């Protein structure tokens, strides 16, 4: 994903036409539920699709995309496997909120809730990835082996595997599948 060319877009990734069209229509549909004008939303907000296809890029280059959206109101749209990562970025960055996409959830109400600025830490529904787990996920995404990670993090290989296993439980998936 090229962040410089996306910085004028309010929905990332813009090349995902189904997500772009669907979210655009959802925002228009909830116009009566939100306090801001559609033009202000288009100008001030960035909606980011955290799905399994794009997760590797967001993990490996999180400092880049976070700096690219600085000054914008960032809303993360999180699939089930990316909820813990979305919570991590919410806690550790200037993210406005997270919309959890699930079968039993009303996405319209959740989207309006976040846009209106009502999303709070108490609304976090799942565990979040810890800082150490995130470091290990990043290094794994860069292709590093557990032994190298242990040497860099000054811990045992067993500790690296434990953090990976804990992160995988929170992400409902093996890390290597997410970062392919």
From Swiss-Prot:
One of its GO terms (biological process) is regulation of DNA-templated transcription. It comes from the Bacteria. It is found in: Cytoplasm. GO terms for molecular function: DNA binding. Belongs to the EcpR/MatA family. The gene is ecpR. InterPro entries: Sig_transdc_resp-reg_C-effctor, Tscrpt_reg_LuxR_C, WH-like_DNA-bd_sf. Part of the ecpRABCDE operon, which encodes the E.coli common pilus (ECP). ECP plays a dual role in early-stage biofilm development and host cell recognition. Positively regulates the expression of the ecp operon. Residues 122-180 form the HTH luxR-type domain. GO terms for cellular component: cytoplasm. Keywords: Activator, Cytoplasm, DNA-binding, Transcription, Transcription regulation. Residues 146-165 bind DNA. This is HTH-type transcriptional regulator EcpR. Pfam families: GerE. Its main location: cytoplasm.
